[in-house]
Amino acid sequence: MPTLSQLVKKGRQTLTEKKKSPALQGNPQRRGVCIRVYTTTPKKPNSALRKVARVKLTNGIEVTCYIPGEGHNLQEHSIVLVRGGRTKDLPGVRYKIIRGALDTAGVAKRKQGRSKYGAKNA
């Protein structure tokens, strides 16, 4: 507990809230280039091969992004649009690639929730 004179000299330091997606620097989306496209296994109770990509953003920051939906056309040097939003069972994956934007194709034969996967009306 600080004394009154210590508070007069220094004052209280306000706690800054931790950002959930710091690499976006306050922007809703950011463009980037795929460096590596690969699969990872999720945390303990789940089992799968999750599709992820290492992306270098336009601000120079490198992030790991999840590729949502079934099947994708991404490869090295693909230009992608990245948004915030973590994948709970993949540690360190705090971003998602937006389907149907730039080089990323939408999910084929998608009937429900099309807007989330960039699928056109068939």
Swiss-Prot record:
GO BP field: translation
Keyword Ribonucleoprotein among UniProt keywords: yes
Pfam families for the chain: Ribosom_S12_S23 (PF00164)
PROSITE patterns referenced in this protein's UniProt entry, alphabetically: RIBOSOMAL_S12 (PS00055)
Coiled-coil intervals, chain numbering: none
InterPro entries, per database record: NA-bd_OB-fold, Ribosomal_uS12, Ribosomal_uS12_bac
HAMAP family given in the database record: Ribosomal_uS12_B
Single GO cellular component term: ribosome
Highest taxon in the source lineage: Bacteria
Region described as Disordered: spans on this chain: 12-31
Name assigned to this protein: Small ribosomal subunit protein uS12
Function summary: With S4 and S5 plays an important role in translational accuracy.
Assembly and binders: Part of the 30S ribosomal subunit. Contacts proteins S8 and S17. May interact with IF1 in the 30S initiation complex.
Entry's family note: Belongs to the universal ribosomal protein uS12 family.
Organism classification: Bacteria, Fusobacteriati, Fusobacteriota, Fusobacteriia, Fusobacteriales
Key words of the record: Ribonucleoprotein, Ribosomal protein, RNA-binding, rRNA-binding, tRNA-binding
Gene Ontology MF terms: rRNA binding; structural constituent of ribosome; tRNA binding
